[in-house]
Amino acid sequence: MVELQELYKKTITPALQKEFGFKSVMAVPRLEKITLNMGLGEAVADKKVIERAMDDMIKISGQKPLITYARKSEAGFKIRAGWPIGCKVTLRRDRMYEFLKRLISIAIPRIRDFRGLSPKSFDGRGNYSLGIREQIVFPEIQYDKVDAIRGMDITITTTARTDEEGRALLKAFGFPLKDESR
């Protein structure tokens, strides 16, 4: 069993059950999935950009990403419907917990000028989204082999019903959220 998964079952679940007064252990919020998305607008000019981005995603997530395609043509962006414009990965179970551990302990502290994650990035239903500007914060990416700095969106989906429950869950995992009072 993964370290964070064990922490969740033994420590976080009883603490959240007591804090929010859940009668059943199954009512306690838990992580459902983590989605990584990389939008690649520059792929319009060079098709190799998608391949390089997919290689980065494989190294970061440990599984093959799905290529996302443009749904409709957009003349302003010079995009046609059906063209590849990004890639995404959905992590669940063990890979999700492994990724979360690396994100919290290694990647987030390596972000330049980092002062904590915004507590305003919850969506109203306990899910949290954050953007990373550089993929090089992950140790799996070798800086000298990077062709371009690419960012990505990371969405952490939970079973929490409110932002307060989601915030408590992520704080219990050690997520570096800023205090809301500031």
From Swiss-Prot:
InterPro entries: Ribosomal_uL5, Ribosomal_uL5_bac-type, Ribosomal_uL5_C, Ribosomal_uL5_CS, Ribosomal_uL5_dom_sf, Ribosomal_uL5_N. Belongs to the universal ribosomal protein uL5 family. GO terms for biological process: translation. Keywords: Ribonucleoprotein, Ribosomal protein, RNA-binding, rRNA-binding, tRNA-binding. SUPFAM superfamilies: RL5-like (SSF55282). GO terms for molecular function: RNA binding; rRNA binding; structural constituent of ribosome; tRNA binding. It comes from Coxiella burnetii (strain RSA 493 / Nine Mile phase I). Pfam families: Ribosomal_L5 (PF00281), Ribosomal_L5_C (PF00673). This is Large ribosomal subunit protein uL5. This is one of the proteins that bind and probably mediate the attachment of the 5S RNA into the large ribosomal subunit, where it forms part of the central protuberance. In the 70S ribosome it contacts protein S13 of the 30S subunit (bridge B1b), connecting the 2 subunits; this bridge is implicated in subunit movement. Contacts the P site tRNA; the 5S rRNA and some of its associated proteins might help stabilize positioning of ribosome-bound tRNAs. GO terms for cellular component: cytosolic large ribosomal subunit. Part of the 50S ribosomal subunit; part of the 5S rRNA/L5/L18/L25 subcomplex. Contacts the 5S rRNA and the P site tRNA. Forms a bridge to the 30S subunit in the 70S ribosome. It comes from the Bacteria. HAMAP family: Ribosomal_uL5_B (MF_01333_B). The keyword Iron-sulfur does not apply.
